[in-house]
């Protein structure tokens, strides 16, 4: 026993600690890989483009000069999950002005019409970044300049279900782009209540759910939330995978998005199914 009267760690404690650290590091990549399988995306047939929206702080917890190397290490397991892949590009998209993305990461390079000059190949992983809103990126960078649209959009621990203000500020336009273009999208959550709130919000948009479940690739590193000191949570414990609108309500959902979200965002609060959440 130590002089502080603490129990010395056993071999089992060391194994549990090692597993917690490894799963915490690999959870993001494995969660993306599972979402690619659920959405029938086949990396063996063509290069895969992944858009990562509003990157979480733990991904960016290194100096800018080492960010690209750190991100490649975090997501490299994707290339092992799909050993015959044609290459991956992960594009970090954020409107956060506190980070100068032009100095931290290269600009996106994968275009719709790939050419032989692009350094994509088997088991290759490239990380790039773009600063600005997602709506602007899709409309101008993808649709006009010809850069690749996403095979999968990813948001780790999104906070759009925590407050109406945060939802309106960060996610209304993003959800409109994702749903109207029928992009496959993965959301992960640390808390069951947050996952349920997000499900109710997305369901109010007549979203087509591919999967809503516990994440088998969640982190095993347990943490506490300041607002819930008696509870513990693990990163990416739950996941939701969506793609477009429900087939039987696609036209009405598009009509709603075009009128309510674009012309009058304040009317968002009139939706009964969402208002009761907050």
Task: Describe the role of every protein-language-model region.
Residues 172, 176, 180-278:
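C-terminal functional extensions of proteins
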Residues 167-171:
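Alpha-helical interaction elements in eukaryotic regulators
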Residues 1-152, 156-166, 179-184, 188, ...:
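Positively charged, amphipathic N-terminal segments that serve as targeting/anchoring signals
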């Amino acid at each position: 026993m130590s002089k502080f009267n603490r129990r010395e760690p056993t071999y089992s404690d060391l194994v549990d600690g090692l597993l917690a650290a490894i799963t915490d590091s690999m959870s993001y990549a494995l969660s993306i890989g599972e979402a690619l399988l659920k959405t029938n995306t086949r990396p063996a047939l063509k290069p895969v483009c992944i858009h990562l929206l509003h990157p979480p702080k733990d991904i960016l917890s290194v100096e800018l000069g080492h960010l690209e190397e750190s991100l490649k290490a975090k997501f490299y397991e994707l290339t092992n999950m799909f050993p015959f892949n044609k290459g991956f590009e992960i594009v970090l998209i954020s409107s956060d002005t506190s980070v100068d993305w032009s100095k931290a990461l290269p600009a996106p390079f994968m275009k719709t019409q790939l050419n032989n000059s692009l350094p994509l190949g088997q088991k290759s992983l490239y990380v790039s970044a773009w600063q600005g809103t997602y709506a602007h990126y899709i409309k101008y960078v993808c649709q006009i300049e010809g850069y690749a649209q996403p095979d999968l959009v990813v948001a780790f621990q999104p906070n759009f279900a925590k407050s109406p203000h945060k939802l309106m500020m960060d996610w209304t336009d993003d959800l409109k782009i994702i749903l109207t273009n029928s992009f496959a999208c993965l959301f992960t959550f640390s808390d069951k209540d947050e996952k349920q709130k997000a499900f109710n919000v997305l369901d109010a948009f007549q979203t087509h759910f591919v999967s809503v479940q516990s994440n088998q690739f969640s982190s095993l590193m347990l943490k506490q939330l300041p607002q819930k000191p008696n509870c513990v949570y693990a990163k990416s414990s739950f996941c939701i995978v969506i793609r477009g609108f429900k087939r039987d309500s696609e036209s009405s959902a598009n009509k709603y998005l075009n009128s309510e979200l674009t012309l009058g965002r304040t009317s968002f609060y009139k939706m009964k199914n969402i208002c009761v959440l907050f």
